[in-house]
Regions:
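Flexible, non-catalytic peripheral segments of proteins
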Residues: 1-3
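Structured functional modules or segments
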Residues: 5-79
Length: 79
């Protein structure tokens, strides 16, 4: 019987509202804690710190500064 290999569970930090990415505060491989800012999002002429609601390691960055995003889009992926 072949060995079963568990794939790491991945979790996306999503945009809570539509806006434009101002800055990405993390890079792939960074270890973050719950509450750490991952992205700054400009929405309705206000800059919003988008934080992670769990700890993990950054697996992927899904956005870049200047990019417009819709509510619910993955900003970063944690593993």
């Amino acid at each position: 019987m072949p060995a079963v290999i568990d794939k790491p569970k991945k979790y996306g930090v999503k945009a809570p509202l539509p806006g434009v990415i101002v800055d990405v505060k993390v890079k792939p491989g960074d270890e973050i804690k719950r509450g750490d800012t991952v992205v700054i999002l400009d929405a309705m002429k206000m800059e919003n710190n988008i934080t992670s609601d769990r700890a993990g390691k950054i697996a992927e960055i899904c956005v870049a500064p200047g990019e417009s995003v819709m509510e619910g889009k993955d900003l970063v992926i944690l593993e």
